[in-house]
Amino acid sequence: MVFSSIIFLWVLLPCILLLYYVSPKPFKNGILTVFSLFFYAWGEPRYVVLMIFSVLLNYGFGRLVEKFGKKRWLLALCVTLNLLILGYFKYYNFLAEVLNPLLRGFDIALPAIQVTLPIGISFYTSQALSYVVDVYRGENQAQKNPLNMMLYISFFPQLIAGPIVKYHDIEEQIENRTVTLEGFSYGVKRFIFGLGKKVILANTFAEVVDAVYAYQAADVSQAMLWLTALLYMLQIYFDFSGYSDMAIGLGKMFGFTFIENFRLPYTATSIQDFWRKWHISLSSWFKEYVYIPLGGNRRGTARTYVNLWTVFLLTGIWHGAGWTFIFWGIYHGFFNVLERCFLGKWLKQEKFRPLAHIYAVFVVLIGWIFFRADTIGQAFSFIRYMFVPHSAVVLMERYMNRKLWMFLAAALLACGPVQWFWMKWKGRVLAQDGSVTVTSWIGYMAILWFSILLLVNNTYNPFIYFRF
């Protein structure tokens, strides 16, 4: 189930809010947990048991790690079991495809099993691992109540596509939290804002992108390929940041505060800067649980470069089982290392700032082509024909309408300038007896109304990060 569905917006969300607020405090966590399991089972009934098993497994390891102290073998066993579960469900098909041709000469073959990927397995496995590692490090005590552990892993706003919430960031909120009218109001607005980003912008761009990628790049005009690359760059941002906005807003409605997951990433002036602003919860997770344990930048220049490349290779693998994701991770690792070597010093100079921004946007845009393509070959073909003039066979005129251009202009402005102007305007209006409240609510209600109108009239409503 997705947040941007009519049944969630008009039936399930009002029901859980009503039930939560009329229930006594001792029952609130239980109600959220049961609803979260129901929410997951709605879209993934076969694998809700797998998620419950993952929760109980890591709950047990947390208790054991705390009881027996810093036993590295115990932590290693926990990490290994989690990765084996993740590896089987997410990577078995890919590994079988890659290894079976190599094993054919030895009369060995991995069984041809089409394993279905459970929704959100990368996200909830990452959270579970952060919990056990935090207990091992002594940063927090093991959770004694399995129901609270279940809520931490399965809480429906962030279960399927993040943000990835580290246990030490939310431990106190699980035990004790309050909801204020101001916080609830902010949550509603944030949810509507995210819904608009997803339904109005991301879905519109997705239809064009999917249509173009269905053809050979050689059959599509050069201008259309560039436009498609730009549209996908915007689609994935508004799709994923929209979901994060909705998750953060829902969390606020129930008294939880999640970390921000995006900070205008397309205003970045380097690839390092981009990763400080894009999918922040994942970048933070890899830094805390992979990069720093590997030694970070404390063991010399060469080791730092190896650590960086390792992290970005794993980032690519985390996103998906395929050569395109692996290449995408290596690609970003290359530019991070390049900036560490020498390029970063130039990019930081004020006189190069406009060029630095163009460089960052261009590198990210090309990278997204590999992320979106079905194969490495398709990605390179797409890029090749972006730069090689050729005659188009396929005309995409039916997508080139006023609606697309209007939404494209709005999206480009929303990636940076509009938000900057909004903060300045909001600050001035706030001084005028709070009139911003009425004005902003009118705007949010307009976004909600238009989003619902589009949902009713269009069944095309995918979420990119549900695949991970």
Regions found by a protein language model. Name each.
Residues 1-415, 423, 427-467:
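Membrane-embedded transmembrane alpha-helical bundles that form the catalytic cores
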Residues 418:
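Substrate/cofactor-recognition hotspot
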